[in-house]
Curated annotation (Swiss-Prot):
The gene is Adh1. NAD(+) binds at residues 10-33. This is Alcohol dehydrogenase 1. InterPro entries: ADH_Drosophila-type, NAD(P)-bd_dom_sf, Sc_DH/Rdtase_CS, SDR_fam. It holds the Pfam family adh_short. It catalyses: a primary alcohol + NAD(+) = an aldehyde + NADH + H(+); a secondary alcohol + NAD(+) = a ketone + NADH + H(+). SUPFAM superfamilies: NAD(P)-binding Rossmann-fold domains. Substrate binds at S138. The active site is at Y151 (proton acceptor). It comes from Drosophila montana (Fruit fly). Homodimer. GO terms for molecular function: alcohol dehydrogenase (NAD+) activity. It is an enzyme of class 1 (oxidoreductase). Its EC number is 1.1.1.1. Keywords: NAD, Oxidoreductase.
Length: 254
């Protein structure tokens, strides 16, 4: 998918990886970039507008834990303005295994609910034009950081959901792929809580090993968007973009 002249909704587009990805996206010249985030950041929005004045950058406050009906209401406003949306990026995430319910609500349920809401406008069975979903998951969905099992499991769930979305594309007209960053130097990683405090230094220990910058991750994210491969499981790690081949251990045969 060429980003130029497209309409993109980016959930959590002002976070660590999110903001650098938003910067790279506006450089590529979409028609509209609509950012949905829990916390407004007027300085960041102004910066994005300045990077490419031809791009219309819009912000709406959004909490991914709201009911689906609330998200549909917000999307109605956005679709009324844009008429069409080409790409939805689900990027909301927290890393704090003290907050068990919220971790699941943000990292998994929020992704499911936001995707479910946009189906009201995209699903070809409802007369929709289809669309593309890019879900930010994590390499911990492949193999857990076992000291944060709740976070890791929430990302594995989001990855499984995304893989199913891709398989449903012939029915819905909506394609999907996952973005799975490795350890990236963001405020999220510097200090966070392990489950039951099994390892108080888990963030510090991770940063003792090779990592990547948010810019490296963002640049590869844009490459994945441009590749636009339904069902792709993209690993964005150590500055590289790798297509992961998923090993099938079981099949429902339906």
């Amino acid at each position: 998918m060429a980003i130029a002249n497209k309409n993109i909704i980016f959930v959590a587009g002002l976070g660590g990886i999110g903001l650098d990805t938003s910067r790279e996206i506006v450089k590529s010249g979409p028609k509209n970039l609509v950012i949905l985030d829990r916390i407004d950041n007027p300085t960041a929005i102004a910066e994005l507008k300045a990077i490419n004045p031809k791009v219309t950058v819009t912000f709406y406050p959004y909490d991914v834990t709201v009911p689906v009906a609330e998200t549909i209401k917000l999307l109605k406003t956005i679709f009324a303005q844009l008429k069409t949306v080409d790409l939805l990026i689900n990027g909301a995430g927290i890393l704090d295994d003290h907050q068990i319910e919220r971790t699941i609500a943000v990292n998994f349920t929020g992704t499911v609910n936001t995707t479910t809401a946009i189906m009201e406008f995209w699903d070809k069975r409802k007369g929709g034009p289809g669309g593309v979903v890019a879900n930010i998951c994590s390499v911990t969905g492949f193999n857990a950081i076992y000291q944060v099992p709740v976070y890791s499991a929430s990302k594995a769930a989001a990855l499984s959901f995304t893989n199913s979305l891709a398989r449903l594309a012939p029915i819905t007209g909506v394609t999907a792929y996952s973005i799975n960053p490795g350890i990236t130097r963001t405020p999220l990683v510097h200090k966070f809580n392990s489950w039951l405090d099994v390892e108080p230094r888990v963030g510090e220990l991770l940063l003792e090993h090779p990592t990547q910058t948010t810019l490296e991750c963002a640049q590869n994210f844009v490459k994945a968007i441009e590749a636009n491969k339904n069902g792709a499981i993209w690993q964005l790690d150590l500055g590289q973009l790798i297509a992961v081949e998923w090993t099938k251990h079981w099949d429902s045969h339906i």
